[in-house]
A protein has these predicted regions:
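C-terminal soluble interaction/assembly domains
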Residues: 290-292, 299-338
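Aspartyl protease catalytic domain
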Residues: 147-150, 155-308
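Hydrophobic membrane-insertion alpha-helices, especially the h-region
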Residues: 3-21
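Zymogen propeptides
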Residues: 16-31, 35-206
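Glycine-centered loop/turn motif at secondary-structure junctions
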Residues: 46, 310, 342-344
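Low-complexity, Gly/Ser/Thr/Pro-rich intrinsically disordered linker/tail segments
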Residues: 336-373
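Catalytic cores of large soluble enzymes that bind and process phosphate-bearing ligands
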Residues: 10, 26-30, 290, 294, ...
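Short, solvent-exposed loop/turn segments at the edges of secondary structure
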Residues: 139, 210, 276, 359-363
Length: 373
């Protein structure tokens, strides 16, 4: 009798495992590879510490190579007409070129190209590529600069991150929003790893933490990156607050202690000293948003890149290959943004510009769209 009960219990467990794990391995929202889907499933079932240890061990023994040349055409060379504004619509000045870390500079490195949908004929989005530092010269990262005089920001919420809902804005991007969409990009960590809160559209999904790095979207579509202060409140002017860890950049310089192995401050997943795919978001002194994303980055590299791109305050967003994605769209002037006219900031980014238009996409993300006049 005991043996039969044991066999039955094992069969029930195996059936559950096949259903649960099998469903996860078939779910594209958990990652592009079977390995990443298994890792997300394991984290959701109490094995976060094992997954984190395994990933740390892997990446610690597979650091990016030192030196070396870039693949052919890895650096985007801007066209001669990329920064010409054709109207007098109020907009920010074209950003100054980024001074590369590695010398000599490669032609086009750090120089901006206007891309994507224009706003009343004026470029609202500029992108560039450069090597992340003077040592790992076979890698390239992407930088996007967004003119928030021309663009409006929005936080889309997911059933996986932050969970809960329903939300007024969630994947897929609808036709009404696709008509003005310029770019979409990843947000932050899973909420149980973000060490911060989540507020959107009058709903406090996760309580906000004082001191946390916060991406704040206001009712007029402008956005900011700040440390959430003890006297700050969610007023009627605030639409969304997405927190993730602590500020990486403050007062236009990297914050102190970035090399400290503090998994609470900089995130338990992969730690802070491992070179992996990372992304970050900052705000410039004149209100533009800057996004940085790419491979082979540690937390210090990411902060240095954000400062070099002009950020006065900045925060880390999501990390790891499957989650770092920035896509921009170039439809006809009155057309809808979509996969067919989308392009990624870096060709090596996992996923495609279609992910934000898929109903299965379950993580939160950020969009910038042409501002209504």
């Amino acid at each position: 009798m005991i043996l039969k009960s044991l066999v039955l219990a094992i069969l029930v467990f195996l059936a559950w495992l096949a259903f649960s794990l099998g469903g996860a391995l078939l779910n594209p929202a958990l990652g592009s590879s079977l390995g990443s889907r298994f890792a997300e499933w394991a984290r959701a079932h109490g094995a976060s510490s094992i997954v984190n240890w395994s990933e740390n061990e892997w990446y610690s023994h597979h650091s990016p190579p030192i030196g070396g040349a870039l693949p052919r055409n890895a650096i985007t060379v801007p066209s001669s007409s990329s920064s010409v504004a054709t109207t007098q619509v109020p907009h920010l000045p074209t950003p100054a070129a980024i001074v590369p870390f590695a010398s000599p500079a490669i032609p086009g490195e750090g120089e901006w190209s206007a891309v994507g949908r224009t706003v009343d004929g004026v470029p609202a989005l500029y992108v560039t590529t450069l090597r992340p530092d003077a040592v790992h010269t076979s890698y390239v990262v992407g930088v996007a600069w967004m003119d928030m005089k021309l663009l409006s920001a929005r936080l889309y919420s997911g059933s996986w991150i932050p969970g809960g809902g329903p939300y007024p804005f969630t994947a897929p991007v609808r036709s009404a929003q696709a008509r003005t969409l310029v770019a979409a990009f990843n947000a932050g960590f899973l909420m149980n790893s973000a060490n911060g809160g989540y507020y959107t559209n009058n709903k406090m999904e996760v309580p906000l933490r004082v001191g946390a790095a916060s991406f704040v979207v206001y009712r007029n579509g402008t956005a900011n990156v700040v440390a959430w202060g003890p006297s700050m409140k969610v007023t009627s002017n605030v639409v969304s607050v997405r927190q993730n860890l602590d500020l990486l950049v403050n007062d236009a310089k990297p914050v102190a202690g970035l090399n400290a192995n503090d998994t609470i401050q900089w995130g338990a997943t992969l730690g802070n000293s491992v070179y992996v795919w990372r992304s970050g978001l900052g705000v410039t002194s004149d209100g533009a948003l800057v996004y940085v994303g790419g491979p082979g980055l540690n937390i210090t590299d990411l902060a240095n890149l954000l400062v070099r791109a002009g950020a006065v305050r900045a925060m880390e967003l999501d990390i790891n290959t499957d989650w770092v994605n920035y896509s921009y769209y170039a439809p006809s002037p009155l057309g809808l943004a979509g996969a067919a006219n989308g392009r990624q900031l870096l060709n090596a980014m996992t996923g495609t510009p279609a992910r934000y238009f898929e109903s299965w996409w379950a993580r939160d993300f950020i969009t910038v769209s042409a501002r209504k006049r």
